[in-house]
Amino acid sequence: MPAAKRAKKATRAKKSTKAAIPAATKKILLVDDDAEIIESMRTILEAKGYTVMVARDGSQGIAVAERENPDLVILDTMMPKRSGFLVLEKLRREYGHPIHIIMVTANEVNRHRAYAEMLGVDDYIRKPFAMERLLESVQKLLA
């Protein structure tokens, strides 16, 4: 094989390795008031190597996001102090750098999904959901 082809192939291999950046370099903020759901998501995400932070309500979620600069936020829609919609709106309007946001909800109302999409949510997942579905979305957004 000519040297130029070998070099090109090696460069491609390095790029594909870079594309598979270790999950440990990615920070995820979970914002949900349901401790059981938080622990389920945290267990799966930490097992995949992500750094996981937790906030138990919307106000705390905004504060943690501003302080920790996560790469992705997984956000419940219905929480005390501030709804997920208000958190989504504030993060999209005032956050200092691009951030991916996934909303999770037990609500079946389609207008809520439309509102979340209007505010700029990256994915909208209805509860109960398979953790594989969530993980697939996380991996896609953080690729």
Q: Model-derived features: where do they sit?
A:
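The feature encodes the CheY-like receiver
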Residues: 38, 80-81, 109
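C-terminal output helix
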Residues: 129-139
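The short loop immediately C-terminal to the conserved phospho-acceptor aspartate in CheY-like receiver
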Residues: 34, 77-78
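Active-site beta3 strand of CheY-like receiver
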Residues: 68-74
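Acidic catalytic/metal-coordinating carboxylates
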Residues: 57-60, 83-87
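Charged docking surfaces used in two-component/phosphorelay signaling
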Residues: 39-47
